[in-house]
Amino acid sequence: MRQIQTDRLIIRPLLIADHDELQEILLDPQVVRYTRYRDLKTPENFDNVFATHFLETPFAFGIETKIDHKLIGFYEFHPEATTGVLTYALSQSAWGQGFVAEVGTAMMAYGFEVLNFERIEAHYASHNPRSGKVMAKMGMRDLGSFGISVSPHTGEVREVMAYELTREDWLLNGSQQQAV
């Protein structure tokens, strides 16, 4: 993937040079509280995930600010047949600025045009409704409850909510933009 630019951001493949900044983001308990990465607790845990999951993949991307070229988070797809399940996280300093929705619009195009997904889905914990609002801003449709999830590490029980966007709806809504 070449980089994709939005008004304020650069979306690009993650690099070895991003290790320390991404580690800082993903080892922040508040950032990963509602994500699949909440069980990363140590630099060693992160190192393994970084090497095997974030580098050299067409599915994970760094989010960098144009103004100072700082890595502020990541966005990724988990492919499941013709569906891409998305995950994203931003450093706390980047919260509340509309970055995820801005990136999401470009990444929907990438998911449909380049990765050829027929459907993009996103999940969030019911007690984190801000994520649901961001998904709606990205043009996704609320599917309601996806079921209950129990953390294998903490035993925490969460209701998981889901949103989706189909290729057909994306084309009908005219929300597409150039992906690459």
Which functions belong to the PLM regions below?
Residues P43-E44, E56, A125:
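Conserved, charge-rich beta-strand/loop surface module that forms ligand/interface-binding patches
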Residues M1-Y34, A60, E64-V180:
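Acyl-donor (CoA/ACP) binding surface of acyl/acetyltransferases
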Residues F50-G62:
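A short helix-loop-beta-strand connector motif used in the catalytic cores of GNAT acetyltransferases and
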Residues Q30-A51:
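Conserved GNAT-fold acetyl-CoA-binding loop/helix
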